[in-house]
């Protein structure tokens, strides 16, 4: 897989957003590039292959030049051709990984990039609770939107796409002595467990363990159910993976600092 990564990477350090299995490019947009940084850093650590670290460093050069310095975090998801939360969240996580395995000025440089991207990512997150009308399911079950992130300017709902971002915030809080970052990580962590269905608290979900993907908190929707309800679009896999990362903190840092 990593050999394929090296083959796909462009000269400017970016990775194409969409490609076929024969490596022909469908969408050359580089907004998804930070998603490749994480496995490359992990691959370097596990296989001791410096090519993977060199590739990860090249992605950071692209991220700094085209995303972070311009505050232009775009099209990280496959279904949104626009600014989205995921691009800034993963840019912060990518440079966080690189800062964990570097020292001195290089470490500081990546840490500064992480901080800049993280603050932008935080602009997607709610600091208040959106009101719901009586009879709307989310309001009736007491759903609080603080700590949840909006998805993109195209897909205007909230979700639990967070993965290691709370870890990033806690680390930045220690690195820069900014307690408000770890404080908000705690808000995210406690708020995103609200809709986890268990016996006696099913949250409108039919089965224990499933977690809703599209949580609709505005009058905008995909045309299904509307504000205060879940959409019937449902990808149960990534929601569980995201929460798994959120509620097993410190995994990347523990592995990368062995």
Residue positions per predicted region:
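Glycan-recognition and catalytic cores of secretory/periplasmic carbohydrate-active enzymes
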Residues: 1-258
């Amino acid at each position: 897989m990593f050999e394929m990564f090296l083959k796909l990477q462009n000269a400017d350090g970016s990775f194409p957003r969409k490609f076929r299995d024969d490596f022909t490019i469908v969408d050359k947009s580089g907004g998804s590039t930070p998603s490749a940084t994480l496995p490359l850093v992990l691959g370097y650590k596990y296989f001791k292959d410096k090519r993977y670290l060199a590739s990860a460093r090249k992605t950071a050069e692209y991220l700094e030049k085209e995303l972070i310095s311009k505050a232009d975090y775009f099209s990280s998801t496959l279904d949104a051709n626009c600014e989205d939360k995921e691009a800034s969240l993963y840019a912060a996580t990518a440079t966080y990984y690189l800062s964990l395995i570097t020292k001195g000025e290089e470490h500081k440089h990546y840490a500064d990039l992480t901080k800049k991207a993280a603050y932008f990512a935080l602009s997607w997150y709610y600091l208040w609770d959106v009101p719901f009308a009586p009879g709307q399911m989310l309001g009736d079950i007491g759903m609080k939107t603080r700590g949840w992130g909006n998805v993109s300017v195209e897909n205007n709902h909230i979700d639990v796409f967070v993965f290691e971002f709370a870890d990033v915030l806690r680390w930045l809080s220690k690195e820069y002595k900014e307690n408000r970052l770890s404080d908000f990580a705690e808000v995210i962590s406690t708020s995103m467990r609200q809709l986890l269905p268990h016996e006696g608290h099913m949250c409108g979900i039919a089965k224990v363990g499933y977690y809703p993907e599209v949580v609709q908190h505005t009058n905008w929707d995909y045309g299904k159910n509307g504000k205060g309800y879940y959409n019937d679009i449902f990808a149960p896999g990534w929601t569980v993976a995201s929460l798994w990362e959120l509620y097993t903190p410190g995994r990347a840092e523990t592995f990368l600092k062995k």
